[in-house]
């Protein structure tokens, strides 16, 4: 586990909020295990503050809070329960947000994050094995987002 004390923004860093839940962990661990993402470019946040499941991937950054995720990452995956949203400190600016949250429509995300580029993705249980069929819907994206 790595902690960063001062903001060190890197465009390639991916933040996963809810990174130890089944969808967030499915994404994070599959990206790492398949070599699609470097551990040093993955920032995770969860309620417990634990690295459950990520111990075999030194360099993964465990964020303290949403402010730290936003300071470190250009792209943020929201994989939390709808009742836990919005999170304290949620102010993503113009970052790319990918929401896995059930029952939180894009309109609500756009209301809370008017500058963000928003993608609503709906992975299923196959996410834990890297075999999820994941339909998605996007608002306005930049060419670099795709």
List PLM regions with ranges:
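A short, basic/flexible loop-to-alpha-helix module at the beginning of a structural domain
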Residues: 1-9
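Structured catalytic/translocation cores of nucleotide/phosphate-coupled proteins
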Residues: 9-10, 71
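Short acidic capping loops at alpha-helix termini that bridge into adjacent secondary structure
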Residues: 38-41
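Short helix-loop capping/hinge motifs at secondary-structure junctions, enriched
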Residues: 141-145
């Amino acid at each position: 586990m790595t902690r960063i004390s001062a903001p060190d923004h890197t465009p390639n860093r991916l933040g996963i909020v809810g990174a130890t839940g089944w969808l967030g962990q499915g994404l994070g661990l599959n990206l790492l295990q398949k070599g699609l993402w470097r551990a040093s470019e993955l920032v995770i946040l969860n309620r417990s503050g634990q690295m459950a499941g990520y111990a075999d991937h030194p360099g993964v950054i465990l964020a303290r809070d949403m402010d730290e995720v936003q300071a470190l990452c250009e792209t943020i995956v929201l994989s939390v329960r709808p009742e836990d949203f919005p999170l304290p400190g949620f102010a993503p600016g113009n970052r790319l947000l990918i929401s896995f949250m059930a029952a939180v429509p894009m309109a609500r995300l756009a209301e809370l994050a008017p500058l963000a580029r928003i993608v609503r993705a709906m992975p299923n249980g196959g996410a834990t094995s890297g075999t999820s069929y994941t339909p998605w819907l996007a608002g306005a994206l930049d060419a670099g987002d795709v």
